[in-house]
């Protein structure tokens, strides 16, 4: 998942989306 889609991808997962080296991470 790319950075631009990260917030939507992580939404509803109680996550704080971060982006490292172009990679989306949903950090709980």
From Swiss-Prot:
The keyword Disulfide bond applies. Keywords: Calcium channel impairing toxin, Disulfide bond, Ion channel impairing toxin, Neurotoxin, Ryanodine-sensitive calcium-release channel impairing toxin, Secreted, Toxin. SUPFAM superfamilies: Scorpion toxin-like (SSF57095). InterPro entries: Scorpion_toxin-like_sf (IPR036574), Toxin_alpha-KTx_8/9 (IPR008911). Expressed by the venom gland. GO terms for cellular component: extracellular region. Disulfide bonds join 3-19, 6-24, 10-26. One of its GO terms (biological process) is envenomation resulting in modulation of calcium channel activity in another organism. Pfam families: Toxin_6. It is found in: Secreted. It comes from the Eukaryota. One of its GO terms (molecular function) is calcium channel regulator activity. Has the structural arrangement of an alpha-helix connected to a beta-sheet by disulfide bonds (CSalpha/beta). Belongs to the short scorpion toxin superfamily. Potassium channel inhibitor family. Alpha-KTx 09 subfamily. Calcium channel activator. Rapidly and reversibly activates ryanodine receptor 1 (RYR1). This is Potassium channel toxin alpha-KTx 9.6. It comes from Hottentotta judaicus.
């Amino acid at each position: 998942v790319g950075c631009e889609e990260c917030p939507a991808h992580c939404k509803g997962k109680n996550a704080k989306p971060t982006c490292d080296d172009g990679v989306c991470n949903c950090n709980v």
